[in-house]
């Protein structure tokens, strides 16, 4: 896990590409330094609902495209499997990372695992819709693969742990 470590230039570039492709080119990327700061960022009351809406619109469009290319039952089984496995794996990794930092906040660990499972679902949806490696959800998933936890946009900042 790279959470809490300084951001690599490639991670900053991916984060900037992700938020820009969602329609937020002026949002800056900020590193979140530890689990406690991550909890505060995740619970910020002024998180961007526009960011969430942009992701949701993109998800719906991808799902529509994926359903035009794949049988619905097969697609749903595959997406459920991806989400379930990602949740199982990421929960264990998040728990270990948090414990090493002296954090035992089970709710925060579940949030981190849920975010990873959602990113895996979104990346699988990109594949099912025959999207490319630079689709915003594929880029977001790369951040998770690098051991990062995108915490969303608060104000004019994309928080990356």
What is each stretch, according to the model?
Residues 1-161:
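Short, glycine-biased loop/turn motifs at secondary-structure junctions and
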